[in-house]
Amino acid sequence: MRILAVDDDPVFLMLLEHVLTAIGYKDLRTVESGAEAMTLLRDPRQKFDCLLLDIDMPGMTGIELCRRVRALQDYHDTPVVMITAMKSLDFVEPAFRAGANDYVHKPIDELEMRTRLRMVGDLIEERRRRASVESRFSTDHGLPVINVRFDEPVALSEAGSVIDYLALENYALTLGRLRLYGHSVLGFKVTNAESIFCSTDGIGYIDTMANVASVIDGALKSCNHLIAHAGRGEFVAMISQRTDLDVDLLQDEIDLAMDRYAHLHEALGIPLPDVTVGRILHTGFFTRTSVSSLFKEARQSVRDVAMVR
């Protein structure tokens, strides 16, 4: 794994190199500014598998750098781990919204960094496997292809509040029990997602799910929120307040917005997504519900609602 680390503190970069070498990651390049990083990333002779970005840098911050990195075709889905010494978590949501996959605290803990980079390595291998399948199909048939599995999350980028599912889980984990108590979680389900999946190719399916995400994003515009596709046409939204939204009103708004796509879907021969809204969930102050359990509960909730709708 080739890693690019960006931090304005040369002493920290030396310490980071020591930690990474100790845990087996020796292919490291370091630079001290966002501008230097962008020059390297735009160089076709350079290729990095993972980026470690300090958030609090003068000039171009790590969050702004992450946003610019995501605009580069070669790095639109490269794993990005943010690094910070800041105690406040106010930066966390903007970082994930800009495209970060995870984050670690300074001073760097060797075990934490090993765990984070192991997850990054798994992500890289999965993406390489998919890219290999797509490349073989494209070569054999002369057509562009995106390999999508129905059960798995797909990366969507059409709406400003949409992030990867793993990134949403990582964001929720950063909140801790007390901050998570102040959030709400809500599930959405495209009940005919399997029919849509079978009626089009990977590109068409992703485009359709992106349209659904955009509609959900618009319906939640009154709340600060993040959304992720979770697989099987299901979405999870995190709202940064304990809210009691009128889900019936939300359902009506989504139905109306989806109807605007009816002519397009009829022309394409793809079923119009039928979106169901689940129940709003909160964690209890004294409960220790895990993030994964909370998200699973949100998905099960919307499945239950869809069964009787």
Pin down the residues of each PLM region.
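Active-site residues of response regulator receiver
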Residues: 7, 54, 84
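A short glycine-enriched loop-to-beta-strand structural element that forms part of the catalytic core
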Residues: 225-240, 263-297
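Conserved long alpha-helical elements within nucleotide-processing catalytic cores of c-di-GMP signaling
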Residues: 154-173, 179-184, 191-217, 228-232, ...
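Conserved acidic segment of CheY-like receiver
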Residues: 1-20, 51
